[in-house]
């Protein structure tokens, strides 16, 4: 399995990105590509045996690495690629906490509750813990997971402020952050 620049696989990246993430959960692709010019951001296509498997977008600093987007082609799911990608990220960033967001699992009335719990269990099986940090992004409630509990709400906000800039961060994404 190889991690290659997403710019080499724009067509496959675009297709997977649009099918794996609802429109209200996607950042503009042009922005993601342009932000990879910064040393702390990485947008990769996952390739195995010359076949496109998935995508991963990460943002990092000296303390931790945030998995902004991770998706595996539907036909490749259930074959261990998600776990392999997460293990690769962890092995390439020794000493750093790896964190990511999933849709909030506290509301049992949402239509995709079982899917949310299944996703939570997948990440827990890969060493992630619930950090008790809730984030509302573009009207969707999320919870932050991490491989260690040393990531705080302020850490997350600072990382995203560095990525998006203060005005964009407030205006579009993080008007509501709650630590439960």
PLM-predicted stretches and their roles:
Residues 70-77, 104-106:
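A short, internal acetyl-CoA/4′-phosphopantetheine-binding micro-motif in the GNAT/acyltransferase core
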Residues 1-27, 154-159, 172-180:
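Short amphipathic alpha-helix that is part of the acyltransferase structural core
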Residues 45, 50-59, 64-71:
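Conserved beta-strand in the GNAT
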Residues 41-45, 55, 142-144:
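Short hydrophobic/aromatic beta-strand element in the GNAT-like acyltransferase core
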Residues 72, 78-92, 115:
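Conserved acetyl-CoA-binding loop-helix of GNAT-fold acetyltransferases
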Residues 93-115:
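Conserved GNAT acetyl-CoA-binding A-motif
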Residues 19-43, 47:
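Active-site rim helix/loop that mediates acceptor-substrate recognition in acyltransferases
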Residues 115-116, 136-180:
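C-terminal "cap" of GNAT-fold acetyltransferases
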